[in-house]
Amino acid sequence: MAINIIVAGPRGRMGYEAVQMITKEDSFRLVACLDHKHDGLNLGELEQFSDDLQVPIYTDIDSCLKQHQADVFVDLTTPEVGYKHTKTALEYKVRPVVGTTGFTDEQLSELKELSKQQQRGCIIAPNFAIGAVLMMKFSKMAAKYFPNVEIIEKHHDQKLDAPSGTAKKTAELIQDVRESQKQGHPKEEETLPGARGADMDGMRIHSMRLPGLVAHQEVIFGGAGQTLTISHDSMNRASFMDGIRECVNQVMDLEELVYGLENLL
């Protein structure tokens, strides 16, 4: 039986790729889309999509969820609306799969509680690329032996949040095995504010935003006489589709919120 899916943000770069992937999967059925405009139109009426995509577009999430019996709500929007979408989907007992980052700890706690109350799975993944998830796992392994580490994340210049959710998640995983410590010279001084990057438990995180980039990260470890670099590069957004496909399938069997694709692999 096909899984009925709603996609929020279909005209974005990630959303467009997700629509293409979902409509090619025999076990998935795209029943509706949520967008901030084009209410009442079908996807096929928009220039970037195939004419035969007769999938209705809504601008109001309540109307969308009331009109369609969806199993999964895939949100690929922005932090400003992603939290509201996720919360509303759970209230309608629809399982969210969320690629939007930038949620606060308080928002995540609220969504975890709501997911349990509704007995509906929810997956929030800072990164859907399988390679990026492995990079985070390998970084956690390396941090046991190399506690001095800095993270450099590079993204396209339209990304709104910094540092990226992937960088923060990587740092959180490293925190699990690394004692808090200040890195660098104890008397170091920034002659330009922010030159040393963001400080997370003594680790430094540096964010780059440039046109031409998609999603890239290096985790650089330093030790006596050696360095170790673990890196991942997404060359295009097709790299995220295997992760989204996996999440859509697995969220159907969950009854609580899972944060991070690494917890499903």
Swiss-Prot record:
It comes from the Bacteria. (S)-2,3,4,5-tetrahydrodipicolinate binds at H156, G165, T166. One of its GO terms (cellular component) is cytosol. Pathway: Amino-acid biosynthesis; L-lysine biosynthesis via DAP pathway; (S)-tetrahydrodipicolinate from L-aspartate: step 4/4. NAD(+) binds at G9, P10, R11, G12, R13, M14, G99, T100, T101, A125, P126, N127, F128. The keyword Transmembrane helix does not apply. GO terms for biological process: diaminopimelate biosynthetic process; lysine biosynthetic process via diaminopimelate. Its main location: cytoplasm. Belongs to the DapB family. This is 4-hydroxy-tetrahydrodipicolinate reductase.
